[in-house]
Amino acid sequence: MLSTGLLVLLGLAGSLWAQHVPPTVVINLDLSPEQRWKPLQDVFDINSLKKAAGILMSTLIPKWMHQAFGPLIKSLEKHVSHPYIEEIHGIARWTKINPADILILNYAYEFTAYCTSIVAQDRRGYIYHGRNFDYSYPVLRDLTMNVVFFKNGKAAYCGTTFAGYVGLWTGMSPYKFTVSGNQRESEALLNMLKNDISALLSDGLPASWVMRETLEEARDFQDAVLRLSKPPLTTGVYYIVAGVRAGEGVVITRDRKGPADIWPLDPSTGGWYRVQTNFDHWLPPLPSDRRREAAMVALNKIGQASINMKKLHQVLALSPVCDRKTIYTTLMSAAYPREYTTLIIDKGCHRPST
């Protein structure tokens, strides 16, 4: 029933707000890594994928940087962990895109995304989790997809990602937990690539790969929090995790080497929600970034007694929480996995604040 439910769910992900629904791709983890992402070619036009990859490469990575790092990235493939390098080679074969370019793009996504994530608990103890995924490149709207990962013949977990990307920034393990990831660091791209390579050589893992492994392996919310807190990463990140029981919500602020802060829900003292953007929650954001403030004002106005999935969606749809760079919005609850909903935000949000 769960397998069918997830497929129906993700195929009809606009049932609450029926617009801009991404396609769904089923990935069979029982296949060899090289074969897993072959279903991409049944959903996406390969020529369109190649064109989109070219646009991203030319805008994300300056030509001189691509020429400098391309050969180096290829030589570093032996340091990329299983099964991701094999999956990347499989994608390269089906799309006829240089595997080094796909690897570069997979790493570039790690430190160029801006997001808002919210976890909230109502007075009955139900947990709601929502996120906006923001990115400067509109072409990603054409690459956005929902993914259902099957293992041992059953739907194991699901998420939202981009064609050609093997990690997850948004995901759900049904009846266990949901998780989203937000970029933390704001270094220049060149420095990030240098640090990324250094971390790779030191056994650091991309944050989105750790998320995917956690979705696949963690037994419950507590186990997920431990798994997301410990491993060395290639970049700093915020992990926002929500469970199925009252109090199971937390923001994990990660350095490359470990946790910098753990910020749990605390409804007994008024902390019934947590809003995380791309700044440490104990620091003021940039004056030009009002996402956190706007979300908190809206949540306080709604109140814990009235929060639900629809109200959370309304908060995420407000400007400037949603802006012209917002690629997609996801709403999810691990206790009610059929409510997993992703909407592509066509052309972003331009409405005034209310």
What residue ranges belong to the model's regions?
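C-terminus-biased signal that marks the final domain/tail of proteins
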Residues: 5, 9, 15-114, 215-354
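Loop-centered beta-sheet repeat module
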Residues: 180-182, 188-228, 235-237
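Context-dependent free N-terminus signature
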Residues: 1-2
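Internal mixed beta-strand/loop scaffold within catalytic domains of large alpha/beta enzymes
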Residues: 104-200, 209
